[in-house]
Amino acid sequence: MSMSSIFSRPRLVVKKVLARAQNEGDGAIVRRSIGRPELQNLDPFLMLDEFSVSQPAGFPDHPHRGFETVTYMLQGAFTHQDFAGHKGTIRTGDVQWMTAGRGIVHSEMPAGPGTQKGLQLWINLSSKDKMIEPRYQELLHQDIPKAEKDGVSVTILAGESMGKKSQVFTRTPTMYLDFTLKPGSEHHQPIPETWNAFLYIVEGEGAFGSSDSTTTPAHHCLVLGPGEGLSVWNKSSKPLRFVLIGGQPINEPVVQYGPFVMNTKSEIMQAYQDYQLGKNGFERSRQWYSK
């Protein structure tokens, strides 16, 4: 294991946030990192939740407008259905990339017994894309590119790593990489220099940014400063698993009211009114209830 970064300007950790458990939805437990008061958002990212849900809890019918949600199952299965008649179940290792655009009403509920776990990321849309038609990309685990070398394995949900590239279309340019490092291994991942980036530790502990940095355990979100890429070392005796997420900043005002994310307060008021009255993208919401 080398003790130095391959980057002349490695990205260092500039902020560390512990994602504490809280209640959300209907009886669900989430660990929120981005979206907490101390890390309100990290352009273009609005929220990251690590969720843990057992039946009958879940996320019953609720609306969205103005952003994308990316749901990545770590354990178990979730069934999603919406007011446009779309219904699907994602299982361990699967991803659902949902563009809410001008409006969606949907439910997300556990699809089986036991505890269902996953990550949900909210990605902002630029003003020109906020009112587009909703769309979905569902990625099955076996179809998601993966690579492995020198004790490091990666699943490439978006972006590229270790010579492999994801085919997922991201309206806001995004990378989303799921890494596992065996004990004693290291990895150096380039990140576009103009992008904001952070990582979330799912299990184990690692040294991030510089080899002499203090190791950080699971359920922490680490915001990375500017530079060419991230260097990480697993000096422990157990595997380290973390997701590395980066994106091109949108650099527009963010006004959020619950499940609506727009650029101005008046647009938020309009979204709330559209949802209440069932118009401008929410036409089907008044007659629809999930089964």
From Swiss-Prot:
Classification via Gene3D superfamilies: Jelly Rolls
Compartment list: Nucleus
Pfam family, one: Pirin_C
One Gene Ontology term, aspect cellular component: nucleus
Name assigned to this protein: Pirin-like protein
Homology family: Belongs to the pirin family.
InterPro entries assigned: Pirin (IPR012093), Pirin_C_dom (IPR008778), Pirin_N_dom (IPR003829), RmlC-like_jellyroll (IPR014710), RmlC_Cupin_sf (IPR011051)
Superkingdom of the source species: Eukaryota
UniProtKB keywords: Nucleus
PANTHER family: PIRIN-LIKE PROTEIN (PTHR13903:SF25), PIRIN-RELATED (PTHR13903)
The keyword Manganese belongs to this UniProt entry's keyword annotation: no
UniProt key word Transcription regulation: no
